[in-house]
Each structure stands twice: as C-alpha cells, then as structure tokens.
Amino acid sequence: LLGEDMDAETIGRSILSFTNCHPYYTQQLAYQTWNNWKQNGYSDTLVETAITELTHVHDMDYERLWSTFNKTDKKVLIGLTMQMGTPSSLPFLQAVGIDSPSTAFSSLKRLGQQGYVIRNEGYELDDPFFRRWIEVKREGR
C-alpha cells in the first residue's frame, strides 16, 4: 500500500520512539508523516521531515511558552533536553549552572505540576516537539 521501499514497521517504530508512545503526539506525528507521504511519496527522511515541520509549526507557541519560564526552569529544561544526567547530580547542576540540588528539585516539581516535565525512568519533557524545539534553538539551527 505505501510503496515497495517503505518499511511501515520501521516508520512506526521511529514515530513511537520519538513520541515515547504518547498517544497525542504519536497521532500528530503519524498524521503529518502520512500527509507528507501522500504529497511527496516515500523518502528515508519521511518521519524526520514531519518532526521538523511540526516543530516549526509550533515555533511561535514555544517561543511564547519559553518566555514564561524563569531562568532556573529554563536551565532545567535545557539540561533535560540535552540529557545531562540526573537533575540532582553534580555534573547536571554544574553543566546548567544551578547551585544546589534543592533548587533543581523545586524547579522539577514546579515544571511537573505544570505538566511540562514527567517522571518515567527519570525526568523528561512531556512534549517531544518542545524538546526538539529546545534542541534546535540551542544548536542555533
């Protein structure tokens, strides 16, 4: 149905890996991937292109959201995005410029209550597109 070169299982796994199986974000990414395939045909970068497009679509939303965070929250979000380790660890704190574990924990608690950070095996951003947006902004792309 999707084409000889298309490996639906690989595409599905790529989508689920990026979204961490979150239903809402999985649906968004699957829909955008499908639309891109329908418009442009299959390519090896089908999922990555959809991720880039969805991140770009929400750029202004993420800019506005980012401006609402205090400096500590921004540092924690950057540290989580860049996978700098456990937020209470010395390497994490030094890398992001936070002086104490209690400050980082207060930020994590606040970000968790607001729904931006979740705890699974460790702390992570709930929205994978927001995570990608932070990565892109940090790299200056």
Task: Go through each PLM region and give its residues.
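Alpha-helix initiation/capping motif
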Residues: E4, F18, N40, V47, ...
